[in-house]
């Protein structure tokens, strides 16, 4: 394990006085885990502390783990050009518990938080404009949740006769098929065209 990252993790944990729930090093990057209510203070510290200087905001991403009690993980990626280090800050939440917006610390987080709200349904408090950014105005649900149907709920297409966009229920071309993935597949007994050389 990289000693510099271990030292950095110890320093951050000491300075943040109990706000870091856990930490780990994977792929030469430090990951720390914090509670939703502490995210603004933690990111402010990581950005402004002289030993850290993680002032380059890379992005925020969302992850859905349906089996967990707090199924959503919001992951903040920061870079310290002066320390030549990256850090990942993870916050877990559920469908009901909002996370404080970090726009005051990193203004570039605005659209990332809107994307996570749109695609996962994670709520951010004190966000100035928390509305959908990628899906259509009347879209129902959050498409990156694991429980969202693969086919969606409606099909959208432009109707040339009506000269407008039309929403229709999903029309699957094939009925639902239940595959038995546990049974072994033996293959065919006959030679397919083009496979004559394989039988010789």
From Swiss-Prot:
One of its GO terms (molecular function) is NADH:ubiquinone reductase (non-electrogenic) activity. It is a peripheral membrane protein. Keywords: Cell inner membrane, Cell membrane, Membrane, NAD, Quinone, Translocase, Transport, Ubiquinone. PROSITE patterns: COMPLEX1_30K (PS00542). Its EC number is 7.1.1.-. It is found in: Cell inner membrane. It catalyses: a quinone + NADH + 5 H(+)(in) = a quinol + NAD(+) + 4 H(+)(out). SUPFAM superfamilies: Nqo5-like. GO terms for cellular component: plasma membrane. NDH-1 shuttles electrons from NADH, via FMN and iron-sulfur (Fe-S) centers, to quinones in the respiratory chain. The immediate electron acceptor for the enzyme in this species is believed to be ubiquinone. Couples the redox reaction to proton translocation (for every two electrons transferred, four hydrogen ions are translocated across the cytoplasmic membrane), and thus conserves the redox energy in a proton gradient. Belongs to the complex I 30 kDa subunit family. HAMAP family: NDH1_NuoC. NDH-1 is composed of 14 different subunits. Subunits NuoB, C, D, E, F, and G constitute the peripheral sector of the complex. This is NADH-quinone oxidoreductase subunit C. It comes from Chelativorans sp. (strain BNC1).
């Amino acid at each position: 394990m990289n000693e510099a990252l271990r030292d950095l993790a110890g320093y951050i944990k000491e300075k943040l006085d109990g706000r870091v729930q856990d930490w780990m090093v994977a792929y030469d990057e430090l990951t720390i885990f914090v509670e939703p209510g502490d995210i603004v203070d933690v990111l402010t510290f990581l950005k402004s502390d002289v030993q850290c200087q993680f002032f380059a905001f890379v992005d925020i991403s969302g992850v859905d783990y349906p089996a967990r009690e707090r199924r959503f993980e919001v992951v903040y990626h920061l870079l310290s050009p002066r320390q030549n280090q990256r850090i990942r800050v993870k916050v877990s939440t559920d469908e009901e518990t909002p996370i404080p917006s970090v726009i005051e610390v990193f203004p570039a987080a605005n659209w990332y938080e809107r994307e996570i709200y749109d695609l996962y349904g994670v709520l951010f408090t004190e966000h100035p404009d928390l509305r959908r950014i990628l899906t259509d105005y009347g879209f129902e649900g959050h498409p990156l949740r694991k429980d969202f149907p693969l086919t969606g709920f409606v099909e959208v297409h432009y109707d040339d006769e009506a000269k407008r966009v039309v929403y229709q229920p999903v029309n699957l071309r094939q009925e639902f098929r239940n595959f038995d993935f546990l049974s072994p597949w033996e293959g065919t007994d006959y030679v397919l065209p083009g496979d004559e050389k394989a039988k010789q």
